Amino acid sequence: MMGKGFLDCESLVALQEMALHPIDLTASGCLSEERIQKNSLSAEGFTYSYATERVDDRCLEALQGLTEERELIKQMECMQQGAIMNRIEGFQSESRPVLHTATRAWVRDQDLHEEAAAIARHSKEEALRLAEFLYIARAKFSTLVQMGIGGSELGPKAMYFAMQGSCPSDKRIFFVSNIDPDNAAEVLREIDLEQTLVVVVSKSGTTLEPAANEELFRQAYQNKGLSIAEHFVAVTSQGSPMDDKSRYLEVFHLWDSIGGRFSATSMVGGVVLGFAFGYEAFIEFLQGAAAIDAHALTPKMRENLPLLSAMLGVWNRNLLGYPTTAVIPYSTGLKYFTAHLQQCGMESNGKSISREGKEISFRTSPIIWGDVGTNCQHSFFQSLHQGTDIVPVEFIGFLHNQRGLDCVLSGSSSSQKLFANLVAQSLALAQGRDNANSNKRFKGNRPSSILVAQQLSPRIAGSLLAFYEHKFAFQGFCWGINSFDQEGVSLGKELATQIIGIMSGNAPVEFSEARGMLRLFNVLT
């Protein structure tokens, strides 16, 4: 199903030769209007510009060839139809399908195979139950606290703030994720418990962080003499320890084939987004994601937004050797989006073992980081322009703000100034500027792309979420790694359990290294 191995692809050999002398973006006339128009793609409400990437037609043709040799579209089709994509062949692994796309497939007409169709059907059933629940809950409660960690917090939180500016709401939303009790204490100080719905999210029903925070909140409700069962909602898998209607006002379900970092379009995001903005806004969000799911099956790379972005990322990472990628949204609504992308990209593709269980000898996921523009222009952009490391930048922008507030100063509005800064940074990174004063010299040839929509609406938020989900999936397919497990988080959790045992006096085994550390910090005597 994966075609040739990544390093065996003929297209990769051609790309390696091209990478020795990539296009010079600083050359006079390089960024002509013809190049800018040609190296762009408009689809599904977005315009994507990659004229400031160090690629030319020959390079793009070779990248298209690489997508064909690695059968990336076929792999995407298999994933969306329910093939077993989460596995390591010949080794014990989760061996599951990957069906986050099915959680929104029901909002559009799509022929699905049995496994995917079942998840789509169950997702629709859960959504209809959610609509009934919200009718009562939104009338009764003014506040919602979501408890979860990783994908149970990062995606829903990013999408809540992305939609907040375009969806008027009188609801107050808080997120509690860290096991640090100060996180819970901060939120408890801000809320009226009687008016608050607490949503606890854990697929397994045993995740340490939400379990600990749920206990803190249950104690707070008990101390106030309030009915716990009338204020707590669970989102978990069927049959988990949390799947207990006697302990919760309502229980919503998700499935093993829905990974945490891909779960925002399931009830993991549905309850909080539906409560905050209404059921219709949640459906619009799903429709945006579903539109990109269909678009991601477009065969030609230069007509497929997430595939094109993925392959430009492969070019920057594997051929030009850049170790990090900055994602810079010029939108306050996306202030938590990069944190979600860090998990979605790095937990998916931060792997060094192939799907055949073999050590790989090439680079996989770059470090993903970033912040909101224009703020970050005044913090780390100095390094982007003149630092010793070249960092590809993915700019995200909108032609109109969400809330409608604006003013004109010195002949231009704040929204115009914001967008002008986005374009200026991309051009400055690409073109640079020569100067006899070496301290004022900008070398240029620092690649970037720009993804622009009219406005950050619920539909565009869903599309943006799915765009990056599929970008990272395509990259994992290209590299031949399993983008859908996260074994890297398990070792630290196992050791933490042992250390907790030492600290509580119930250590089952000797762990001299941990004891030494604990004594150093005066935790043990």
Curated annotation (Swiss-Prot):
Entry GO MF terms: carbohydrate derivative binding; glucose-6-phosphate isomerase activity; monosaccharide binding
CDD domains: SIS_PGI_1 (cd05015), SIS_PGI_2 (cd05016)
Name used for this protein in its record: Glucose-6-phosphate isomerase
PANTHER family xrefs: GLUCOSE-6-PHOSPHATE ISOMERASE
One Gene Ontology CC term in the entry: cytosol
Gene3D superfamilies for this protein: 1.10.1390.10, Glucose-6-phosphate isomerase like protein, domain 1
Lineage: Bacteria, Pseudomonadati, Chlamydiota, Chlamydiia, Chlamydiales
Subcellular location: Cytoplasm
Catalytic activity: alpha-D-glucose 6-phosphate = beta-D-fructose 6-phosphate
Originating species: Chlamydia trachomatis serovar D (strain ATCC VR-885 / DSM 19411 / UW-3/Cx)
Family stated for the protein in its record: Belongs to the GPI family.
